[in-house]
């Protein structure tokens, strides 16, 4: 192992933890487009969103101008249970690759949820409790978000109803049991318990489900059950705001040792982890203070950035949610049942979509067999079993490090290791038994889905 002045793990003290979330929209010249009411075609304001979301979260969702928003003390106290999270220098990986590149990863898996999702779940549950609500509803893909929200709701005494994407519900039964242990009810989606679920099943009884389906069901229950609101784990502005703690901690840790990254990499499904990781660095780029390369990595089976279009679309399959302007494959697109359940979303964060459209970041798609090759390589060198979602970022980080090996450049690479893969062993089994396949949508399939996008006057 190499020995340098930089420790293997950089830990911040509790006093160095961020006291404010950073709102990257404040520094964006071109703001994300507003959410639009599908019935009227007009931008949605506070009153329009109240039946679905908690009041203070709506304020955060609509705030494009305040750069720093204070983190309530109660949330900061909860963060101390598992934060600050370590920034790790991947010395072992560097040595194994034989690269001159310096590789760092921000590890968000040191909590029971196994991922970064707890950063936003406690914030959203806090505001729901503060509003006097009885409970909340949500969707979950691989189960990390549902687990994180079940932990937050148990801590604050809120009821929770989770709709879990059917293929993940079946692939990850133990993740389901963790949620139930924390008091949540968990229903496979699509289900026969909602109108939208029944409609989807009537059209395709064998569907594996999608995050878009699960969102539709969760929103339906929230809006028809008194004392409930819907909360979500990704995509919208409020979630990326809460996740900015990842990037803020990362920047503080790097600055302590005088490290400036050249490349920052994150996996991209709905955008919560990537948006949180890059936030303060993107702010510097937007203000003209520094320049970085940002790389979003998505599954080839659900390539919203790389093969989607930048347009208004429904956030959910059942078309009950507001319209968001984002990179999308069409709300009716159901990706193949790949093992990165947290990345199986048809769209992308409006914030990240705007930044990508403006040329401020890059995107690439990778096949899941290649992703698991990288995951296994990383596990054998760094000792952490990574989540399939996180492994998309690992794949790109390794590829960039190997490019440095060819050129001799000593670039500094930072990537987000969003969580662990302890509940993803069915996926690892498929890979180890050589039963994993890559199913990539055809141009015709994507064109058919995109052709059904709603028409919105801009």
Each model region followed by its residue ranges:
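Buried hydrophobic positions in well-ordered alpha/beta secondary-structure cores of metabolic enzymes
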Residues: 86, 105, 117, 124, ...
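A short, small-residue-rich loop immediately preceding and capping a beta-strand
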Residues: 120, 128-167, 260-274, 294, ...
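Alpha-helix C-terminal capping segments
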Residues: 123-133, 147-159, 180-181, 278-288, ...
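Active-site-proximal loop->helix
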Residues: 137, 145-208, 304-316, 424-433
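Claisen-condensing/thiolase-fold acyl-transfer catalytic domains that form or cleave C-C bonds
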Residues: 268-276, 368-433
């Amino acid at each position: 192992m190499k020995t340098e002045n930089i420790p293997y793990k950089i830990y911040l003290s509790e006093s160095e933890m961020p006291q404010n979330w950073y709102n990257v929209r404040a520094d964006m010249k071109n703001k994300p487009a507003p959410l639009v009411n599908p019935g009227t075609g007009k931008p949605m304001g506070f009153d329009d969103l109240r039946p679905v979301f908690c009041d203070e979260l709506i304020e955060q969702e609509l705030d494009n101008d305040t750069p720093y928003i204070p983190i309530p003390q109660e949330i900061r106290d909860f963060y101390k249970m598992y934060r600050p999270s370590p920034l790790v220098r991947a010395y072992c990986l560097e040595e194994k690759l034989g690269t001159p590149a310096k590789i760092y990863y921000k590890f968000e898996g040191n909590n029971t949820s196994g991922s970064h999702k707890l950063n936003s779940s406690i914030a959203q549950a806090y505001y729901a409790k503060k509003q006097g609500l009885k409970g909340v509803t949500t969707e979950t893909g691989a189960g990390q978000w549902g687990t994180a929200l079940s932990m937050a709701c148990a801590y604050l005494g809120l009821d929770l109803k989770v709709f879990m994407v059917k293929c993940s519900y079946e692939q990850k039964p133990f993740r389901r049991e963790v949620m139930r242990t924390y008091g949540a009810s968990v229903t496979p989606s699509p289900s026969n318990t909602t109108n939208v679920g029944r409609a989807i099943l009537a059209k395709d009884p064998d569907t594996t489900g999608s995050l878009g389906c699960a969102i539709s069901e969760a929103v339906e229950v929230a809006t028809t059950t008194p004392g409930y609101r819907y909360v979500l784990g990704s995509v919208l502005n409020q979630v990326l705001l809460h996740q900015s703690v990842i990037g803020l901690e990362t920047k503080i840790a790097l600055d302590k040792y005088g490290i400036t990254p050249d490349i920052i990499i994150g996996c991209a499904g709905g955008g919560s982890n990537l948006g949180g990781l890059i936030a303060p660095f993107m702010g510097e780029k937007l203000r003209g203070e520094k320049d970085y390369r940002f790389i979003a990595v998505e599954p080839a089976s659900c390539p919203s950035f790389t093969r989607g279009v930048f347009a208004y679309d429904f956030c959910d399959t059942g078309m009950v949610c507001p319209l968001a302007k984002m990179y999308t494959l069409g709300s009716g697109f159901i990706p193949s049942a790949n093992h990165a359940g947290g990345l199986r979303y048809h769209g992308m964060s409006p914030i990240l979509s705007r930044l990508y459209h403006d040329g401020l970041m890059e995107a690439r798609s990778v096949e899941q067999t290649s992703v698991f090759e990288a995951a296994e390589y990383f596990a054998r060198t760094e000792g952490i079993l990574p989540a399939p979602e996180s492994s998309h970022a690992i794949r790109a980080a390794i590829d960039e490090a190997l490019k440095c090996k060819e050129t001799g450049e000593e670039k500094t690479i930072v990537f987000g290791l969003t969580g662990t893969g302890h509940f993803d062993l069915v996926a690892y089994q498929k890979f180890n038994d050589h039963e994993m396949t890559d199913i990539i949508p055809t141009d015709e399939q994507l064109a058919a889905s995109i052709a059904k996008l709603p028409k919105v006057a801009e």
